[in-house]
C-alpha cells in the first residue's frame, strides 16, 4: 500500500449507531476497543460496478497520540505523539517493535493504542511541525510562553489533549481545515472548556478509509477551465484555478482569496468564506485540498488533451 493511499473515513453507512459517526462494531465488540486487538485502523473503500481507471492515492497527513496498555506500572498510560501517512501500518510497527519500524520510545513499552489523530494538514511540513510542537510544548515558540504543565490529577492523555487544543488554536494551524478524529470513541475525553478547538475544525469518530481518485480518460468526465466567476477573465493555467466545494464554480485562486478576506489585511487567505456564486460557506483548506487533487490528476493524466482540463464533480 502506498504511503499516501489514505483519506478520511465517515461512519459505515450499513451500521447504524446511536452515537453519530461511531461504528456499531466498537459498541458490540469489546475486543475492538484497543487498536492492537482490532483488525485495522483503515477501512478500505470498495467501488462496485465501476469501470476500472488508473487512480492516484489521495493525500493524508496525520499526527496521532498513542496510549500504552503495558502491564508494567512504569509504562502504563504513557503517551506517544507521532506523525504518519498510514495510521494502520504505523500502529502495527509500534506494536511490532523497533526492528519492524517502531519508534525507540515505544519499543517494549506497549502494547499501544492509537486513540486519536489530527489530520487535514495541507502538507507533511505543516504536520511535522505540529507533531514537534505537540511533543515539545515547553520548547515550541508557539506555546512555550503558556508554560503548560501537567496538573497533579491530570492523566498523561488529558494533558496531551489540552496541549493539542492550544496548538489547534495557534497560527498557522488554526487556519487549516483540520479534523480531530477519535479512532477509539470509547476513549473520548471532553475538550477543555477554556480552549476548545476552532469552530471550523471537524470532529469525527471511527476508522480512516483508504481513498483514491480516478483518472478518467473519458472527455465527458472533464470540463474546460473557463472564466473566473468573479473577474470574468479566462483562467489560463490549471494551477491558478480553484473551485467552490459546494457548487464547483471556477475562480482564480487570488480572486476567491481576496473575496473571502472581505477587507481583512492581516491574512493572506481566508480561513472561512462564502461562495460568491451559491452563497454556501467553504473552508479555504478544503478548497486548496481540492486544487491539489486536480493538479495531481493532471500530472498523472496520459491523455495530453485532458491535462489542462478540470475533472467533473457531482455539482458540475
Predicted regions and their residues:
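GIY-YIG nuclease catalytic motif and its immediate N-terminal context
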Residues: 1-129, 159-241, 276-316
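Short arginine-rich
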Residues: 103, 133-149
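A short N-terminal helical cap/helix-turn-helix that marks the beginning
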Residues: 145-167
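The −1 position to Zn-ligating cysteines in a subset of zinc-ribbon hairpins
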Residues: 227, 243, 251, 255, ...
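Detector for the canonical C2H2 zinc-finger "Cys2" submotif
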Residues: 232, 247-248
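Non-catalytic localization and substrate-recognition regions of ubiquitin/SUMO ligases
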Residues: 243-245, 263, 287
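Cys/His-coordinated zinc-finger cores
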Residues: 249-266
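A short beta-strand-loop micro-motif that forms or neighbors metal/cofactor-
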Residues: 262-280
Amino acid at each position: 500500500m502506498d504511503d499516501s493511499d489514505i483519506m478520511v473515513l465517515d461512519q459505515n453507512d450499513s451500521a447504524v449507531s446511536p452515537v453519530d459517526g461511531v461504528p456499531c462494531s466498537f459498541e458490540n465488540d469489546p475486543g475492538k476497543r484497543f487498536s492492537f486487538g482490532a483488525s485495522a485502523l483503515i477501512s478500505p473503500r470498495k467501488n462496485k460496478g465501476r469501470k476500472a481507471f488508473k487512480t492516484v492515492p489521495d493525500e493524508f497527513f496525520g499526527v496521532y497520540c498513542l496510549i500504552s496498555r503495558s502491564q508494567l506500572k512504569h509504562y502504563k498510560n504513557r503517551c506517544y505523539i507521532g506523525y504518519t501517512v498510514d495510521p494502520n501500518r504505523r500502529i502495527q510497527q509500534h506494536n511490532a517493535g523497533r526492528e519492524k519500524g517502531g519508534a525507540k520510545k515505544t519499543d517494549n513499552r506497549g502494547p499501544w493504542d492509537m486513540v486519536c489523530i489530527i489530520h487535514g494538514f495541507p502538507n507533511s511540513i505543516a504536520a511535522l511541525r505540529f507533531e514537534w510542537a505537540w511533543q515539545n510544548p515547553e520548547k515550541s515558540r508557539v506555546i512555550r510562553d503558556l508554560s503548560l504543565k501537567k496538573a497533579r490529577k491530570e492523566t498523561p492523555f488529558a494533558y496531551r489533549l489540552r496541549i493539542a487544543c492550544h496548538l489547534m488554536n495557534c497560527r498557522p494551524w488554526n487556519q487549516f481545515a483540520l479534523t480531530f478524529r477519535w479512532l477509539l470513541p470509547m476513549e473520548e475525553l471532553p475538550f477543555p472548556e477554556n480552549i476548545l478547538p476552532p469552530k471550523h475544525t471537524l470532529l469525527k469518530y471511527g476508522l480512516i478509509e483508504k481513498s483514491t481518485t480516478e483518472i478518467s480518460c473519458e472527455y465527458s468526465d472533464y470540463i474546460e477551465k473557463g472564466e473566473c466567476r468573479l473577474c470574468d477573465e479566462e483562467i489560463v493555467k490549471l494551477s491558478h484555478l480553484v473551485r467552490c466545494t459546494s457548487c464547483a464554480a471556477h475562480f482564480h485562486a487570488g480572486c476567491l482569496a481576496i473575496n473571502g478576506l472581505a477587507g481583512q489585511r492581516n491574512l493572506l487567505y481566508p480561513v472561512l468564506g462564502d461562495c460568491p456564486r451559491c452563497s454556501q460557506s467553504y473552508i479555504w483548506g478544503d478548497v486548496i485540498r481540492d486544487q491539489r487533487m486536480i493538479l495531481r490528476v493532471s500530472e498523472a493524466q496520459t491523455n495530453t488533451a485532458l491535462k489542462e482540463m478540470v475533472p467533473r464533480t457531482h455539482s458540475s
